[in-house]
């Protein structure tokens, strides 16, 4: 009886080792493809943005954030692309997502403040000025540009 259990255990171990080797090979083969694809999405989006083809940039950035949900650069570029097609609401949405990832970014605080001002969200605009006053030890370009919007 004991030998049957030992044989079964040995067969299971060998099968498990074989399956794990196959899975390891699959992961090693697929992972570089996924990494290349995500870099390719962002690069294609950046090219589209630089060519002022904002719809193309949006298409690729939406794919990129599926693979890189913590890429603040992708969310910021997505916001700028939506601004490029005059969709301030979506621009603000993506800037706010990026803000959850990097709240200390001066440019991002400026962009949120600018779009908030354009949408008439004066409280949010004032909040971004306050954020920039905290982040900028002395006067910085972002706070000057943001305050100039109201003049």
Give the positions of each predicted feature.
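Helix-start (N-cap) detector for alpha-helical repeat units in TPR-like alpha-solenoids
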Residues: 38, 72-73, 106-107, 140
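Register position in tetratricopeptide repeats
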Residues: 50-51, 84, 118, 149
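Canonical positions in the second alpha-helix
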Residues: 64, 97-98, 131-132
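Structural marker of alpha-solenoid helical repeat scaffolds
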Residues: 67, 101, 135-138
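Canonical tetratricopeptide repeat
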Residues: 77, 111, 145-149
């Amino acid at each position: 009886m004991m030998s049957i259990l030992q044989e079964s255990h040995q067969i299971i171990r060998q099968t498990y080792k074989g399956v794990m080797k196959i899975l390891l090979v699959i992961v090693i083969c697929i992972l570089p493809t996924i990494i290349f694809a995500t870099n390719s999405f962002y690069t294609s989006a950046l090219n589209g943005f630089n060519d002022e083809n904002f719809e193309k940039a949006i298409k690729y950035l939406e794919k990129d954030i599926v693979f890189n949900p913590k890429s603040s650069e992708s969310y910021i570029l997505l916001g700028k692309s939506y601004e490029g097609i005059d969709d301030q609401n979506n621009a603000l949405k993506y800037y706010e997502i990026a803000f959850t990832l990097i709240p200390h970014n001066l440019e991002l605080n400026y962009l949120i403040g600018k779009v908030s001002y354009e949408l008439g969200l004066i409280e949010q605009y004032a909040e971004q000025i306050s954020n920039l006053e905290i982040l900028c030890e002395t006067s910085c370009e972002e706070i000057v540009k943001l305050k100039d919007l109201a003049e």
